[in-house]
Amino acid sequence: MNLLERIKKLPEDWKRIITVAKKPDKDTFSMYLKVTLIVMAFVGLLAYLIQLVLAFII
């Protein structure tokens, strides 16, 4: 399948994904949001600590 055929097929694939996908309920969305925020905070804290340590080493 060449690139042009793949590009022409994209809207059909997107439509299929939208019809199969379902909206999460409130509890599931809340859980995903909490997990995402906790992971973002952890990564931010880790990056800050690494930057802080490297600032004192260099």
Curated annotation (Swiss-Prot):
Keywords: Cell membrane, Membrane, Protein transport, Translocation, Transmembrane, Transmembrane helix, Transport. The gene is secE. It is a single-pass membrane protein. This is Protein translocase subunit SecE. Belongs to the SecE/SEC61-gamma family. The keyword Transmembrane applies. It is found in: Cell membrane. GO terms for molecular function: protein transmembrane transporter activity. SUPFAM superfamilies: Preprotein translocase SecE subunit (SSF103456). One of its GO terms (cellular component) is plasma membrane. The chain crosses the membrane at residues 38-58. NCBIfam families: PRK09400.1-1, secE_euk_arch. Essential subunit of the Sec protein translocation channel SecYEG. Clamps together the 2 halves of SecY. May contact the channel plug during translocation. It comes from Acidianus ambivalens (Desulfurolobus ambivalens). GO terms for biological process: intracellular protein transmembrane transport; protein secretion; protein targeting. Disulfide bonds: none annotated. Its main location: membrane. Component of the Sec protein translocase complex. Heterotrimer consisting of SecY (alpha), SecG (beta) and SecE (gamma) subunits. The heterotrimers can form oligomers, although 1 heterotrimer is thought to be able to translocate proteins. Interacts with the ribosome. May interact with SecDF, and other proteins may be involved.
